[in-house]
């Protein structure tokens, strides 16, 4: 054993003096002192369990002792009679074995491969033991789940990621997917459950047993987000449902994740073999599949952006040349050729790397360098995490932990360790770039004329600027020079390191040459320098613009076109990452794919880290808004499609926010017990106004109401039991909080819930029965108008159907024409008096006479007036399709409906573009006169003359 370094010898004395009396009196071996000096986790564990030290000294850890884990754990569980006892014994066993592994790892008693094997098998042993104990307990309670032939059905667990690969790190989440073979019902229980209910309840209990913190800690943090449909999907799926999903909807990233999937426990049983055979064609294609290279390149780009976004420096997992890049290199060969080469189908990295070398897909030298680098990085990662049993891959900045790692990695000091680390990561980066790096070789841009450099460096006299700024007017030329001078003065106030200055000096001549070639150079430069002031201390973003000329070009184009985009980029520089790929920048996410994109995005954030989850939601929204706006500016999205995208994005956000709020509420109170015998959550979110009508703008707020179908006598089933209706009230309050909380990326959306029954004075969440009663007996006409543009944007099918039925019933009530006409007209006149434009020479596109609101009132009036005779008028909630229905049902002439539609879309298009220019929603009084005359005539016809 290598002696402790000088700093650690001094610290060792502090450790020994800090030990409580019984331990301090015992003679400690040199090995024990070394391990206690290295790991606070081991130190705390030994203090709590002195007998473990005796065991370690008398029976030191062995490389093959993982073979005894199952027997040792069975002995520990032999007297367990309830779930609380199970949780306690699992946690103690995990901690005891982790101390043994940390001891062996610190003293290098076993190889790093052995450490990875022990960590993975320990997790598998604990998961399987917990599953088997709970399966027996659940069968006693509910009967045994069987298929149609009466054969017992097991719960199979897929270990994903490093757990599946047998490469778990010291302090790690575990990614799991639950499945059962065939449908059927329980037999022999007090009451019959179908298999889906049985395994869902059992799965929930298994997660709680492993994941829930107690006074003994937790076993593992369990992450179930890799399952089909993520958090919104069923917790457990049948084999048939799994197969359907992966055949019909499986994404590329799910295919990569499935490479490392491994069945926990009995992996050779009939059902295990069936599941494995079912998944194999999805993962390993029969043909050689080169498309994966670009997909993996895209994934790596996403990770690189995440590293920048979260400010991750010195990260040995995600950084350039880190563990993730080695995994990507190996996966490229598995996914391209795995279908034809069985030796590449291993879920473990090192055996696959050997197979890659044997097939001559990589040179022996490259394969060996990757193997050595991988083991070096994994040892460093595990040692780092074993100091405090903490999930981190970021190198320490304090001297003590640096000294600990240098000693344990067998280096004299920290600089020697980081030197070796850099060499390994450079080797990995080289192979990665050759294989997965950008497919376009970086070419040196032609050097710019010396005058652009001099312009930036303030070396040109004003008289000398004529050649480079000749096309600009004298005023614009002076303004450009003033902007450059002011920007340089602003830089002098900032702390910018040598690297930042160097990057700026390379970037600015390029930027100036591009901006100053434009007629609108002064305006564009003013927007871009405002943005640059915000990021000059963050060299990473300057490097992004300097190293990717295309990103710089997109930045200039977008800032020139829209001050709104320039402001967004200045406020949230992480959006600059979106400029890297024009294929996605000007091509927004498919309208039906926002939920899936968001699910992938959130997978990179710890599920239990609310702050990061809130930040990620806001960052995703801003990135998507940028892409929609870029496509809008480029003319690739017409106005209707802009609103469609903004609406689908909002719905994806609502879905994710409800999911987060639900998970938090259920963790605190359990679920309302009326949900025990049914699917879903008994909850719905109804969108009104622009959201309900598919007409959102860039800065629209969300008009929402919340519904539930919870009976009066329902209670939650958690340890902190509360009234079921109180649960839904707190759920709605939590949703409002998640939307409105201001993070560094701002709020998510402004939410207005005042359209609920009785407005601001009413309950925040309403039962479906109370909502129906209010609409029938108390609601005003304007509330029925609002219902025309309402639809469920999140909710169970039965609540959605109930709301739709109530909406249809209310809208199809017979109404006296004159009375309705008067009430609608008077409401519009009140609104105009309150909200209309006070400047006669300006036209408020939305609120003034002849504007958008008049068109909306016309459609609402006609639906309420004629839906009793023509129930089909209730089908849609957006104005354009309502106008189509009015024409199809012979209420409005087709020519008038088409003209109103054109006027409506023209006015909305102008509102979108005013928003992009950060201008208010009004224009000169002589604009849109034809559209306004048309709307006035229609208003006169329907709401005055009849």
UniProtKB/Swiss-Prot annotation:
GO terms for biological process: regulation of glutamine family amino acid metabolic process. InterPro entries: GlnE (IPR023057), GlnE_rpt_dom (IPR005190), NT_sf (IPR043519), PII_UdlTrfase/GS_AdlTrfase (IPR013546). Residues 449-946 are annotated as: Adenylyl transferase. Its cofactor is Mg(2+). It is an enzyme of class 2 (transferase). Its EC number is 2.7.7.89, 2.7.7.42. One of its GO terms (molecular function) is magnesium ion binding. It catalyses: [glutamine synthetase]-O(4)-(5'-adenylyl)-L-tyrosine + phosphate = [glutamine synthetase]-L-tyrosine + ADP; [glutamine synthetase]-L-tyrosine + ATP = [glutamine synthetase]-O(4)-(5'-adenylyl)-L-tyrosine + diphosphate. Keywords: ATP-binding, Magnesium, Multifunctional enzyme, Nucleotide-binding, Nucleotidyltransferase, Transferase. Belongs to the GlnE family. Involved in the regulation of glutamine synthetase GlnA, a key enzyme in the process to assimilate ammonia. When cellular nitrogen levels are high, the C-terminal adenylyl transferase (AT) inactivates GlnA by covalent transfer of an adenylyl group from ATP to specific tyrosine residue of GlnA, thus reducing its activity. Conversely, when nitrogen levels are low, the N-terminal adenylyl removase (AR) activates GlnA by removing the adenylyl group by phosphorolysis, increasing its activity. NCBIfam families: PRK11072.1. This is Bifunctional glutamine synthetase adenylyltransferase/adenylyl-removing enzyme. The lineage of its organism: Bacteria, Pseudomonadati, Pseudomonadota, Gammaproteobacteria, Enterobacterales.
